[in-house]
Amino acid sequence: MSRADDAARALHEHRRAKTDPLLDEAVKPQDLDEAYAAHLALLELMTADGGGPQIGWKVGFTNDKAQARNGATEPVFAGLLGGNSYVGEAELTSPRGTGLGVEAELALRMAQPLSGPVSRQDAAAAIDAVAIAMEVVEQRVRVDEMGLVTMIADGTQQYGSVIGEWNESIDPLTLDQCDVRLQVDGLTDGFMPATEVLGHPLNALTWLSEALGRYDLALAPGDVVLTGAIVPAQHLNPGQMAELASDGLGDIRLWVD
């Protein structure tokens, strides 16, 4: 077994035991390549454990502040699993009773395969629908304790997703003109433009295509891509509700128990 496989098994056990995902030096990934290899192995373990199938990918750290805060020099990616993806609304229980985070994002649905370096126009042509989405995140341990490579291996705090109704009429090239409004318990916590995501949400997709190509992976028709936080993560305590809305894309909701 490789170090990446050992790291994946250890992280999987931490998830099942609901313990902090801290790794011994003997199995901790040594670089980004090992971190992503461990994450891909973890996705296989989680799928076999009933969490799958994989339905796509998320892109994270899509602005300079997020990258600086987490010690990264570029965005990151992680897999999305169908077992914790919901349509329109969801009611989720906080695993540790401390609440969950929610990020306001856009979701893209792929119509064509995509891999390696591509232009924004190529990326737009490969998309057949757009939706608003929430990425649900769980910060199980502080970033400075975990470290970037372990965070990537563990899925970059990914806990689940809520995806709105797919809109097939929007031109993906115009997504930089989209605004979203995130409310928590009826109070607006953020109203932000999609340009918060690398200047244009499609830049997240072009980055992801190139990054996946480094590991001989590709986006496939039907894959869902979360493009990164437009409104930064807002914490929801048990009993709170978040609502995300955008003109032309409808609204979605999340309750935390």
Which residue ranges define each predicted feature?
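A conserved acidic, glycine/proline-rich C-terminal tail/linker
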Residues: A204-A233
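Short, charged beta-turn/beta-strand-edge "cap" motif at the junction between a beta-strand
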Residues: I230-Q234, G248-D251
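Short strand-turn-strand beta-turns centered on an Asx-Gly dipeptide
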Residues: V184-D185, T227, D247
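Catalytic-core "active-site belt" of small-molecule-metabolizing enzymes
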Residues: S2-H200, N237, M241, D251-D257
